[in-house]
């Protein structure tokens, strides 16, 4: 029996609050319509929602952005370099304290103790009404020279993904990667990891209207 799953996604909003009413209206309307048509709907964010170039984000250290994200009911989000590098370590540690969504991140650890951030989880498995297990993993662009200045140590997706595939083997039916890595890395992943089903990309602002199928992986 076939099952339809719809993934709504946002990325690189960069605190463009003037567009938020339209974004929110679209996401909520689209989710309702597709659910009524029988589709399982996931909503995810790909990072760079926060940008301190906007005075409201600057004044609230991104809390105003999280308040808006909360109104959507995201299933999961990851971070971009604007959250990871634009905010101090302390501000990022507090950013998602009142979030009503899960933050997923697999390639950033605290430099001080080597532990992953407390505000993020390495994965999320969502089981649909028909029992399909969807595994969400997430990676952000690993700026190796600048993240350590903020007290974070980034890792390469090329190292982390094989470890995660081994860790979650047999626990999922569909693998979705939330990527703030850029299209070139997304294409590399599709070429080398056919185990991936879908890569939802961001960071480099490429619009793939109908997606791009590489090695059986939908980007």
Residue ranges and their predicted role:
Residues 1-219:
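Acidic, metal/ion-coordinating pockets
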């Amino acid at each position: 029996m076939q099952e339809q799953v719809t993934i709504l996604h946002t990325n690189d909003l960069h605190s463009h609050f003037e567009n938020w009413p339209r974004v929110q209206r679209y996401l909520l309307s689209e989710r309702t319509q597709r659910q009524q048509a029988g589709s399982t709907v996931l909503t995810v964010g790909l990072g760079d929602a926060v940008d301190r170039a906007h005075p409201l984000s600057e004044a609230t250290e991104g809390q105003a952005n999280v308040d808006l994200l909360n109104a959507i009911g995201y299933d999961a989000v990851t971070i971009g370099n604007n959250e990871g590098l634009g905010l101090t370590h302390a501000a990022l540690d507090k950013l998602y304290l009142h979030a009503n969504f899960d933050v997923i991140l697999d390639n950033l650890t605290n430099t001080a103790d080597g532990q992953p951030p407390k505000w993020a989880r390495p994965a999320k498995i969502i089981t649909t009404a028909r029992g399909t297990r969807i595994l969400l993993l997430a990676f952000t662009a690993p700026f190796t020279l600048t993240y350590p200045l903020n007290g974070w140590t980034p890792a390469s997706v090329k190292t982390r993904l094989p470890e995660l595939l081994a860790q979650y083997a047999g626990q999922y039916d569909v693998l979705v990667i939330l990527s703030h890595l850029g299209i070139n890395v997304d294409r590399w992943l599709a070429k080398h990891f056919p185990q991936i089903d879908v890569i939802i990309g961001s960071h480099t602002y490429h619009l793939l209207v109908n997606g791009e199928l590489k090695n059986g992986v939908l980007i």
